[in-house]
Each structure stands twice: as structure tokens, then as C-alpha cells.
């Protein structure tokens, strides 16, 4: 029987007071009964708008219909045809601005909880599936993938399903890219990422860690000396941006990238860590995206008494996912919106002791269509903080550009590609943050999927 409730089933979660002191996953996931009930809210539209909002084009109505019938493994098989990372996507994709944002049920009520259902199905499969993954028959062609983030994993998975011999080259000691070094355990457990990677390995994908492409091996060497017929660059965007204001070199100033990498990958909060993070009482995180929310919530879990999100626009302009903002508010993060830093203050030891700011007000729209923040006269203030984390986005590392002859990039470092993901170098494709700069996991996955199709077509035409 259809469920015509205007509200989606709420996601069970840890209590905010409890979770703000641990790194366990905040959202605990739907039960079977909740998932089936939520799936019955889907109208199974003849022209499903939700699918047009999905970067990897999952057949959403079909998988949800199968959930409603309690055919969870069949639902998983529908999802996995389009997405190599369903357990990841169900947790971190911005569904409210993609598939769920176009759901018809959202016109007069809340949209169907597509992301939560995708997560449920993937988790159910990981817990209950008994049949081993069938390894596709090899087609005899080799492809290299640079980077093991969402773009690289998706490209590798799609190519492996087509029979390609795929090797992923990862610079760090763990595979997963931003999924493991950038997103905290409480939002995306590392065990979930590892299970997704294990699934790709079962398809025949090889993963080589501690391989810095551009240093260990160049792109040209992969093709000319190692026999790869095509290369996909999905190396992400790990070069942090700063404001270039006075005081950014003080002790206690971090990029969000460094702060999160130390916590997520190196466990820098442990007393015996070789890359320790100074525990702070009052922390300011500059920025308003998902990464800023992650950094702020990590600082809180490390024992900070006050954590501020400092953002130059208003609450309604925050680019972070609605759920992440709500979780941060529930945990006690303080939002200082319409506020912009002008200087970081230091004491006699060169350590952060405050941050000068000015209040902002919204003026006329800028090129992005959002109202441009302008300084409010005579509005200077000082925040009493001993740590500042800059979360202002990232750009691609220039190493691959510098070591790949003929590779064209934008002035800010993004690799230039065509609609198939092809770069200016024959047989070399790229996608994800290495092309766009900081973007979402799902958009990176979509780019990896596009490039995989382009690589397949390229190699077929070479035969």
C-alpha cells in the first residue's frame, strides 16, 4: 500500500551531546521497516525527474520499487550498474540539490529520501551478500588511473566491468583519496570506503599505493614504458587556498586540508602521534562548505570549548549540505555569518591569540548570481581564538601539469578536457576536482563515468 505521508522517515542518529565527544558515525541508518515504508512514498513517475539530477544516472524508481518489495539485493544490483560507490554516495552526496531536489513528492511536502535508501541498500548488501563478485573476462587492454578518490574509483570500476586490466596509482599509503583523508569517520567510516574498494579489487582492479605520479612515474612513462593504452587523471585538488591576510603564518593556523588529513589519516589527536595537532580551546573555521563543517565538528570532538564558523555571506547562502549544517548546529557549533576575517593576531611566541574581522552586508548580485557581500562601515570586531582553520577551497597540485608534456590547463591549474573527458594529450583523460577544482563526490563520480566511456570508445577505435 502506498505511503502518502508528506514527510520522509527521519534518519536515526546519535544524540548530539553524545556524538560531539566521539568519532562514531552520526547517522545510524534506516531499519528494514523504515526503508520499506520510505520506499512506498515513491510515486514511480513515468518521467522520473529525479534521475536527471543524478550525476551517475542510477535508475532510481526501479531500485526504490524493489526496496518497497523487500527485494534488497535486486535493488543493489540496479544501483551497482550505474554506481561503483553506493554506500559512499548514500552518505555524502548532496541529494537535496540533485536527485531529491527534483523529486515530485517535494512539491507538496518532503522528497523521497533517495540517499538514505541508497545507503540502506548498499549496507544491506555489504552485510548479507554471500555470492562472490564475478570477475569480467579480460579484453586484453590496460588502463592506468591516477588517484583513488571518487573519480578514479568510478572510472576504474566502470572500465573493469568492461574487461579492462585497470591499475590505480595512489600517492598516499591508503586508497580512497578524499574519501579517507578529507571526510571524517563520523560522516563516512573508513570501513565503508574499504568495502567499496574491496569490491573493485574483486573485479580485478589493482591498487598501487605510495606512487606519486609525476615523481615515481610520469604520465608519459605509464604509456610509453609500462604499456598502458590510456590514462585517467583523477588526482583531485589538494592544494589549499588562503586569504593572504596578515598572520596566516602563525602557529595554530591550518588549512582545512592539512587539519583533516592529520586527523583522518594520521590520528594526530592521539598523544603519541608523530604529526600532532595542538589542542585548542577556541577555534575559528573560515568558510561555509562541507569541508568547513567537517573541520569545525572535528575541532569540537578534539575538546574545543567554542568553535566558530566564520562566513562572509548569510546562513541561507552556506554551500554545505543542509544535513551537515543542521548536525553542526545541533552539536553547538557557533555560526558567525556575514563576518569576514581581516587579520590573524599572534602573541609574543608567534601563536594565534585572536582574529580581527569585519561585519558584512549583502549588496548587488555578483557573477555567480548571489548577492555580493560588502563591508559594513565601522563594524570591526575581534574573535578570541587560539586556532584558525582556513577552508576556502583547493586547487589541483601542479606536479602532473609540470611533468606531462602538452597537457593544457586553466590559469588556476584545472586540467582542460572535452565533453568526453579527453585532455590535450592523446589517450589521456581527466575528471573530478583535478578538472573542476573543489566539487562534490557525486560530480566527481559522474566525471569518472564519462571518462570511462570515452576511454572505452578511444581504445575500441584504435583496434
Predicted regions and their residues:
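Local cysteine-cluster metal-coordination motifs and their immediate loop/turn environment
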Residues: 40-59, 84-107
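N-terminal Rossmann-like FAD-binding beta1-loop-alpha1 element of flavoenzymes
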Residues: 141-167, 292-300
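Ferredoxin-type iron-sulfur electron-transfer modules in oxidoreductases and energy-metabolism complexes
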Residues: 19-37, 59-91, 108-135, 263-264
Amino acid at each position: 500500500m502506498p505511503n502518502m505521508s508528506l514527510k520522509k522517515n527521519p534518519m536515526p542518529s546519535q544524540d548530539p551531546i553524545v556524538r560531539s565527544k566521539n568519532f562514531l558515525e552520526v547517522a545510524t541508518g534506516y531499519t528494514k521497516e523504515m526503508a520499506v515504508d520510505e520506499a512506498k512514498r515513491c510515486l514511480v513517475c513515468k518521467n522520473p525527474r529525479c534521475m536527471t539530477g543524478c550525476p551517475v544516472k542510477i535508475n532510481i524508481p526501479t531500485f526504490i520499487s524493489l526496496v518497497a518489495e523487500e527485494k534488497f539485493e535486486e535493488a543493489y544490483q540496479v544501483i551497482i550498474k550505474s554506481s561503483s560507490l553506493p554506500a559512499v554516495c548514500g552518505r555524502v552526496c548532496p541529494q537535496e540539490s540533485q536527485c531529491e531536489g527534483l523529486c515530485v513528492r517535494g512539491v507538496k511536502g518532503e522528497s523521497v529520501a533517495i540517499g538514505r535508501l541508497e545507503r540502506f541498500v548498499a549496507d544491506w548488501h555489504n552485510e548479507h551478500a554471500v555470492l562472490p563478485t564475478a570477475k569480467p573476462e579480460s579484453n586484453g587492454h590496460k588502463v592506468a588511473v591516477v588517484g583513488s578518490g571518487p573519480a578514479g574509483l568510478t572510472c576504474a570500476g566502470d572500465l573493469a566491468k568492461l574487461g579492462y586490466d585497470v591499475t590505480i596509482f595512489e600517492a598516499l599509503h591508503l586508497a580512497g583519496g578524499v574519501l579517507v583523508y578529507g571526510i571524517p569517520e563520523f560522516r563516512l567510516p573508513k570501513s565503508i570506503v574499504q568495502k567499496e574498494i574491496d569490491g573493485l579489487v574483486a573485479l580485478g582492479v589493482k591498487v598501487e599505493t605510495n606512487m606519486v605520479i609525476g615523481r615515481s612515474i610520469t604520465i608519459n612513462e605509464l604509456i610509453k614504458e609500462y604499456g598502458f593504452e590510456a590514462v585517467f587523471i583523477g588526482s583531485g585538488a589538494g592544494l589549499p587556498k588562503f586569504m593572504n591576510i596578515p598572520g596566516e603564518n602563525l602557529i595554530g593556523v591550518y588549512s582545512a586540508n592539512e587539519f583533516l588529513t592529520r586527523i583522518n589519516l594520521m590520528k594526530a589527536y592521539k598523544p603519541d602521534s608523530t604529526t600532532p595537532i595542538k589542542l585548542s580551546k577556541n577555534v575559528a573555521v573560515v568558510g561555509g562548505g562541507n569541508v568547513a563543517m567537517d573541520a569545525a565538528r572535528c575541532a569540537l570532538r578534539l575538546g574545543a570549548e567554542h568553535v566558530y564558523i566564520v562566513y562572509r555571506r548569510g546562513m541561507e547562502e552556506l554551500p554545505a549540505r543542509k544535513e551537515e549544517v543542521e548536525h553542526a548546529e545541533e552539536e553547538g557549533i557557533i555560526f558567525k555569518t556575514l563576518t569576514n576575517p581581516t587579520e590573524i593576531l599572534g602573541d609574543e611566541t608567534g601563536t594565534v591569540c585572536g582574529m580581527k574581522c569585519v561585519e558584512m552586508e549583502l549588496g548587488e548580485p555578483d557573477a555567480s548570481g548571489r548577492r555580493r557581500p560588502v563591508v559594513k562601515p565601522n563594524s570591526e570586531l575581534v574573535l578570541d581564538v587560539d586556532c584558525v582553520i582556513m577552508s576556502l577551497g583547493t586547487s589541483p597540485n601542479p606536479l602532473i601539469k609540470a611533468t606531462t608534456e602538452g597537457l593544457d590547463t586553466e590559469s588556476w591549474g584545472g586540467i582542460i578536457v572535452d565533453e568526453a573527458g579527453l585532455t590535450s594529450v592523446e589517450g589521456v583523460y581527466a575528471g573530478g576536482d583535478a578538472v573542476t577544482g573543489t566539487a562534490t563526490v557525486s560530480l566527481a563520480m559522474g566525471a569518472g563515468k564519462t571518462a570511462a566511456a570515452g576511454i572505452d570508445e578511444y581504445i575500441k577505435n584504435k583496434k
